[in-house]
Regions:
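Conserved, structured core segments of small domains
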Residues: 1-138
Length: 138
């Protein structure tokens, strides 16, 4: 199973303040542990929302709003993608993360089988082609 581990943005992150050398070293060690255990698949940190944009879809209308998104109470600051056997395993790994003050959400990623008969063989082949192309770029 794959899980997205979503780290909520902090005031410091939204202000563009980067973590200290010590915090980065602790997180680097943690990421190495995840990698050695075969859990770690991907990790990305996000720029502050002031450098982002939102696009709202309503029928054929597209409305773009530039950041920052100060009205939002929960912004994403970054994420991991993990491979674990269960939600409990993912939570267990997360409990060992070297965060001092953070809120983190874990969500299971849909697998192809979750979509049932609507995910036809043709759609499955299309997704496999797209994934193969993306992986070749990495």
């Amino acid at each position: 199973m794959k899980f997205m581990v979503i780290v909520k943005a902090t005031k410091n992150g939204e202000a563009g303040k980067l973590p200290s050398k010590e915090v980065q070293a602790a997180m680097g060690k943690y990421n190495e542990e995840l990698t050695k255990a075969g859990v770690f698949l991907a990790l990305e940190r996000l720029q502050p929302s002031s450098r982002g944009a939102r696009v709202k879809f309503a029928g054929n209308t597209r409305t773009v709003t530039d950041g920052p998104f100060t009205e939002s109470k929960e912004l994403v600051g970054g994420f991991w993608l993990w491979k674990c056997d269960s939600m409990e395993e993912a939570i267990g790994w997360l409990k060992h993360a070297p965060f001092e003050d953070a809120e983190v959400e874990i969500r299971q990623v849909h697998e192809a089988e979750d979509f049932g008969e609507n995910f036809t063989g043709e759609l499955r082949e299309q997704e496999e082609r797209v994934r193969a192309t993306v992986e070749a770029r990495a």
